[in-house]
Amino acid sequence: LHSGIGVFSGKQRTREEENTLCEVWAEVAEYAGRSGITIGIEPINRYESYMCTSAEEVLRFIKRVDAPNLSLHLDTFHMNIEETSFYEPVIAAGSRLRHIHMTESNRGMLGEGNVRWDDLFRGLQEIDFNGNLVLENFSNSVPGMAEAVSLWRPSKYNADELAKGSLAFMRKMTCEHQ
């Protein structure tokens, strides 16, 4: 769950928007909770959203809503833009962290960009993370993908190569940080 992509007011988030956000999250959490569903709130970078752009903001709103089934959903692509550390948001979230999109800084092959994977996995190990690590690769060899996520340069890898190579990298990192 995250705010609308590319929808901006042109101003900083207002108190009224924050209140509305909390009201909506409370209602969604209550509805989902009746079915035992946990909702992950994903901070999205400032170029795509202005409502919640960092883990700290999401955690503050989760605390305000105070619903046990609201959690943090991190995405390493957005973290690379908005966070100063890949370790600290993981530690700050602790058991509230339930889901992570594993994406390289350039949305390409994991391990070939700027994401500090060792810092991320060290944090995950320290909090005894047992949520979902989800590979999120994008290749413009997939029709429509370039327009959807602004991949304007040709991909170095096709979708299958990207998935296989990135999955191998995730497995290697997971084994190194057990």
For the regions a language model picked out, list residue spans one by one:
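Active-site acidic/histidine proton-transfer and metal-coordination neighborhood
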Residues: 1-71, 153, 157-161
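Histidine-acidic metal/acid-base catalytic patches
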Residues: 52-74, 79-178
